[in-house]
């Protein structure tokens, strides 16, 4: 069973700041070795390929409705206040959930 979800309500939270960089700055993915994938369709695709995300991130309203479906998907679940999730998303219409996956290491020559 995964640990309880971590709830974040402040934009000053360091994890929120890190997630926002990852979601909005393409260079951050390369620097951090992780990628932000937004939307339940991408989370379902990861699950179908047996990819276990490092983080699953939910808007609070989404978590209240779908925690039972997603609770075991990632190693850690993060629940953001709805306005924070909207600020995190680079999409015009935020999907209300996303995942962070570890990127494979580049092949060595």
Region annotations inferred by a language model:
Residues 2-3, 48, 100-109:
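RNA substrate-binding interface of SAM-dependent RNA methyltransferases
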Residues 43-44, 64, 86, 105-107:
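Glycine-rich nucleotide phosphate-binding loop and flanking beta-alpha elements
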């Amino acid at each position: 069973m995964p640990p309880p979800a971590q709830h974040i309500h402040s934009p000053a939270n360091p994890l929120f700041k890190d997630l926002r960089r990852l979601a909005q700055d393409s260079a951050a993915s390369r620097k951090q070795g992780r990628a932000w994938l937004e939307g339940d369709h991408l989370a379902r695709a990861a699950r179908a390929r047996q990819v276990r995300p490092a983080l699953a991130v939910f808007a609070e309203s989404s978590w209240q409705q779908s925690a039972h479906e997603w609770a075991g998907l990632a190693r850690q679940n993060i629940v953001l206040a709805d306005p924070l999730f909207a600020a995190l998303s680079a999409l015009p219409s935020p999907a209300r959930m996303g995942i962070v996956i570890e990127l494979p290491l580049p092949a060595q020559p």
